[in-house]
Amino acid sequence: MQQGIHPDYHPVEVTCSCGNTFVTRTAGKEDHMFVDVCSQCHPFYTGKQKILDTGGRVARFEKRYGKKSK
């Protein structure tokens, strides 16, 4: 391995919008990151069905096309 050509690989603390925090590693310049979903609150991992609406997209779709009646 050549010296001096590889990026600095350091720990970064990640905070989710649900309040969960964990530490991972990054080659980026930041020391702290914020994410919208993590394994503690993502529907795939929790088994709970919920809609993750980013930027009102679901509401805009329902307004435009309406909800499907059963």
Swiss-Prot record:
Q: Name one Pfam family in it.
A: Ribosomal_L31
> What Gene Ontology terms describe what this protein does at the molecular function level?
metal ion binding; rRNA binding; structural constituent of ribosome
Annotated binding of Zn(2+), by residue: C16, C18, C38, C41
The UniProt keyword set, sorted, is: Metal-binding, Ribonucleoprotein, Ribosomal protein, RNA-binding, rRNA-binding, Zinc
Annotated cofactor note: Binds 1 zinc ion per subunit.
SUPFAM superfamilies hit by this protein: L28p-like
* PANTHER family linked: 50S RIBOSOMAL PROTEIN L31, CHLOROPLASTIC (PTHR33280), LARGE RIBOSOMAL SUBUNIT PROTEIN BL31C (PTHR33280:SF1)
The cross-references to NCBIfam families, in alphabetical order and at most eight, read: L31, PRK00019.1, PRK00528.1
Its family? Belongs to the bacterial ribosomal protein bL31 family. Type A subfamily.
Functionally, this protein is described as follows: Binds the 23S rRNA.
The protein's name is: Large ribosomal subunit protein bL31
